[in-house]
């Protein structure tokens, strides 16, 4: 029996899929990355927002119509299990999140040996999930209903997993959870992210540590100071702000206002000159007026962010904002999104141009799919999958996980290109 696992949605979902792959492998199952070769297909779904739900349903239907045995798990099932069972009865079984053992039992399998995870990312990086769930009550978000309350993992357990990842050849760990800065508050009764980072920084083989999903109000001084002085934690701040209008932020129940946002960015920049910011905004929230959007647009134009994602609001059942309806037309929401992304495209290019002629450190992820001879990687200011990349011209046979110095020679809107200066040094030194 061959089994294929298809993972949809965010990096946190991907970690769940990798854990499942490890358990299946530990049970002696033959795995395949190609669903067409599989006898059983397990789809790990996302149910966060409308486009993600549609993608999940389309994927389920596609595989269900293929005649293969299909099992569905994840966020979509947590929200809509009864409806799914009724509407797509072709699926053999439905399971919620973290249902790895239940799936093994259903398939009549038992783990013969423990395999923590099977990585589906390049060996250069991996995601490290430090907690599950969320205690926030943002009015637009259904995650607490899907994933439950915040549950931190123990520090020693996380550090052990980081050692496992290092043993696999991983050089960069991307720390993820629904609310990374809340880490430890539930388990240890106080914030413990800095203490966790101290433990992770001691793991041999790990060169970069990247923090993702930082909640604005919990980016405390001790965390900023730690990042400022750390050898491994990158000065990369992924802080989802969602808006900057005081009125909209209040209606979103975010717990801060526009002044707080500006002060936070200013404080980080004051302490970390080369800090890079990524954020996300939501446009088309039910109470967002034209003036609110103009305020957000002006804020984006100020150029605080190297990377920016914009989502159009979609009403989610069971959230505090759901009774507000969806009064802003889809076309208006799309126009607002496109307007912000167009502004940000120019800002990102300008920020990339600041690296022209400079030497940067690049972690190689692999090779460009269309041009298999072109290595590509990322610098400290580029998170995997969501930001741009650096294409590298080199005379060496570069591998995933290599870290090298690259002199930037070209930039585009999102990507950069440069020469492997270490290879040039090797050539010239051999001629002396």
UniProtKB/Swiss-Prot annotation:
Binds 2 [4Fe-4S] clusters. One cluster is coordinated with 3 cysteines and an exchangeable S-adenosyl-L-methionine. Residues 353-422 form the TRAM domain. [4Fe-4S] cluster 1 binds at residues 10, 46, 75. Catalyzes the methylthiolation of an aspartic acid residue of ribosomal protein uS12. One of its GO terms (biological process) is tRNA modification. Its main location: cytoplasm. It catalyses: L-aspartate(89)-[ribosomal protein uS12]-hydrogen + (sulfur carrier)-SH + AH2 + 2 S-adenosyl-L-methionine = 3-methylsulfanyl-L-aspartate(89)-[ribosomal protein uS12]-hydrogen + (sulfur carrier)-H + 5'-deoxyadenosine + L-methionine + A + S-adenosyl-L-homocysteine + 2 H(+). Keywords: 4Fe-4S, Cytoplasm, Iron, Iron-sulfur, Metal-binding, S-adenosyl-L-methionine, Transferase. [4Fe-4S] cluster 2 binds at residues 134, 138, 141. Its EC number is 2.8.4.4. Its cofactor is [4Fe-4S] cluster. One of its GO terms (cellular component) is cytosol. This is Ribosomal protein uS12 methylthiotransferase RimO. The keyword Transport does not apply. Coiled coil: none annotated. Belongs to the methylthiotransferase family. RimO subfamily. GO terms for molecular function: 4 iron, 4 sulfur cluster binding; aspartic acid methylthiotransferase activity; metal ion binding; protein methylthiotransferase activity. It is found in: Cytoplasm. Residues 1-112 form the MTTase N-terminal domain.
């Amino acid at each position: 029996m061959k089994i294929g696992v298809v993972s949809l949605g965010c990096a946190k979902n991907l970690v769940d899929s990798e854990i499942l792959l490890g358990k299946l492998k530990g049970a002696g199952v033959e795995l395949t990355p190609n669903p067409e070769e599989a006898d059983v297909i397990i789809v790990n779904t996302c149910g966060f927002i409308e486009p993600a739900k549609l993608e999940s349903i389309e994927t389920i239907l596609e595989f269900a119509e293929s005649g293969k045995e299909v099992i569905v798990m994840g966020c979509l099932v947590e929200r809509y299990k009864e409806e799914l069972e009724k509407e797509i009865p072709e699926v053999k079984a439905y399971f919620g999140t973290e249902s790895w053992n239940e799936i093994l039992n259903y398939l009549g399998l038992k783990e013969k040996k423990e395999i923590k995870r099977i990585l589906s990312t390049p060996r250069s990086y991996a995601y490290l999930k430090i907690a599950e769930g969320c205690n926030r009550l943002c009015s637009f978000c259904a995650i607490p209903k899907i994933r439950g309350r915040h549950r931190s993992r123990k520090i020693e357990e996380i550090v052990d997993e980081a050692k496992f990842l290092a043993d696999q050849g991983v050089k960069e760990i991307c720390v993820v959870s629904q609310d990374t800065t809340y880490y430890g508050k539930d388990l240890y009764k106080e914030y413990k992210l800095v203490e966790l980072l101290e433990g992770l920084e001691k793991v041999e083989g790990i060169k970069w540590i990247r923090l993702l999903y930082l909640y604005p109000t919990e980016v405390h001084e001790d965390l900023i100071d730690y990042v400022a002085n750390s050898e491994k934690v990158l000065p990369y701040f992924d802080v989802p702000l969602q808006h900057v209008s005081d009125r909209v932020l209040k209606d979103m129940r975010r717990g801060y206002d526009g002044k707080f946002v500006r002060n936070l960015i200013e404080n980080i920049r004051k302490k970390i000159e080369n800090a890079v910011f990524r954020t996300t905004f939501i446009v088309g929230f039910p109470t967002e007026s034209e003036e609110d959007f103009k305020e957000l647009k002006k804020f984006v134009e100020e150029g605080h962010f190297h990377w920016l994602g914009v989502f159009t609001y979609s009403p989610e059942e069971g959230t505090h904002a759901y009774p507000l309806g969806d009064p802003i037309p889809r076309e208006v929401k799309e126009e607002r999104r496109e307007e912000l992304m167009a502004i940000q495209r120019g800002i990102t290019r300008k920020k990339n141009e600041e690296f022209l002629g400079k030497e940067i450190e690049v972690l190689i992820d692999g090779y460009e799919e269309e041009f298999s001879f072109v290595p590509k990687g990322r610098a400290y200011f580029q998170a995997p999958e969501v930001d741009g990349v650096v294409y590298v011209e080199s005379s060496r046979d570069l591998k995933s996980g290599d870290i090298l110095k690259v002199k930037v020679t070209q930039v585009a809107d999102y990507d950069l290109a440069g020469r492997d200066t270490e290879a040039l040094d090797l050539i010239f030194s051999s001629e002396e």
